[in-house]
UniProtKB/Swiss-Prot annotation:
It comes from the Viruses. This is Putative ankyrin repeat protein R837. Coiled coil: none annotated. Disulfide bonds: none annotated.
Amino acid sequence: MDYTHLLPYEIWLNIIDFLDKDKYNLYLTNTNFFSLLDYSREYFNLIDFIIETKSMEVLKYIYQSKTNGLIRNRFVKNITLNTSLLTSCQNGNILLVKFFIEKGANHRYSEDKPLGIAAANGHSDIVEYLVNGGANIKSRNNYALRFAVKNGHYNMVKFLIEQGVDITVFDYEVFYTSCEYGHYEIFVYLMKNINDIKKLNKKRLLKKAFKGGSVKIVHYIFNDILDVYRMFYHSMTRSELKNYKLLNIIGKYGNHDILEYLHNRYQLSDTNNIAQVAALYGHFRIVKFLLDKYLHELNLNQLIISACDNGSIKMVKFLIEKGIDINTIGNSCLSHAILSGNTDLLHYLTNIGCRLTSLENFFMKNLVSFYDIETINYLRNYITFDDQHYINTIMSTSMYCGIIKLVKYFVDKSSLDYESYICGIISNGHVNIIKYLLNQNKITKQNITITINNSVILTIIQYGHIDMLKYLVSLGINICINYALDRAVSYGHLNIVEYLLELGHNINEFGDLPLRSATIANNINMVKYLVSQGANIYIIKDNPIYLASIHGHVKLVKYFIDLGSDYHKKNELPLYVAIINNNLDVVKCLVEHGCKTKTTFFDPIETAMEYYNNEIVEYLQNNEIK
């Protein structure tokens, strides 16, 4: 008997909301509770939940009850057999896989995606079942092998290779993947099945192995694959090592065990770079190891600045204990600590004597963008220059960055000539800053009118600041529409183009410039809009088909042909430029739409041969038109 109707609708809603994810179990308690689905206020995939919990009996009941209106609308209506099959392959339930295939799911759906997902998750029984059913293990560019290797499923990798999958695809990608993810057994097995070891990129192998952190793989590479002994000698020049950038990878990913292995085997070179990278990424153990073993080679000042970039108080303290004179680099440490966003580090550095002696623009942008007023005011106590200069710099940077809360706070504290900042604020599109300064009588509309020139307007348009453009127009600023429209078209700002034309101008007033710019930029949406506004495609001197052909924009070539242009039939230039620019797609498009391959101006086949365009030669020979 169904008792769900005994409680009001609102109470069931509260129960369902309270249960959160456990509500799924409530729905599946018995068949009567299915009716609670009508009370659900959210969309969810209960079928996926059933698959994940491997509730075969519930699944069978649902499919046997398709005539039930609730089940039909809430389950079967939204069930996709193929996607349910994929979920089953991912969860590794072969019974469900067989169930959905029996119900009509395509076991080779989306180029054998079920097999690929099962292989990626290491479900050998499902893979074997699908292969026996005709699935192709090589589909989707060896998807099955590539992801089995990535996820470390050794038995799966072995099975796929035994079935004949190609381990060389994508330039031996699986070898590098096994190194990157540290799967030693898989890497060794792959090496045993390679025919030509020289095909492997040795530098790439090492880079991936250093990133993956497997000492076993690194040892195998050194002992069994390549001779890189000299790479780590002191005799190797810094420029050579910089080109390899191999050891820096250890610093970046913090693989201490590999670093120690290399140290025990070789005398490492350029350890200063490794240490700086490790400090930058916060790998304390690497930095400590290098300080212990190679102290005399390290630039401690550079090292502590990298540690400040990372924001690591622990590392900064450790380096100071090594004897760094903080007074000599206090400004740099504070400036780089600002980049880290770590307020605690700023406090620590100021407490031990660091002071700001200069205000570099790059650091000030970070200061106003990522710190609160309290921290900015705090730093005022630790500067070695005039406080007013600090306030003015904060204010000017805040205006350029559009930080309105800081502008409001410092507006009456600074001694700036705000008129001189109008161009910069407007160029950066900060309408709110300009309006605020106007309201505070720090600038006037006349200041804006006198200051703004065409160059500033074009900069606004280039960066897509449409709100600023509209605001300036509302102030009566004159816009040179011709240049403005061309800039908006060239940079793909369709909303600005629409706005400029809404000001009452005809698109053909400006000659061929807008359509030409849109065509060169390969912006088909812009071209379509301009045409919809009445742009005449024949206004372009060289014809749009020629212009699109010379730049290789095949979609635009076809679009202009579809609009009715037959320039390519009467003129040989589009085909000529497509051939000499080796653009087969454009050549095909022109020929398929009536362009002759026998011309008086030039011989297309001979021209293609002259430019060594073999594919075009073959195509033209097979599609020769008198």
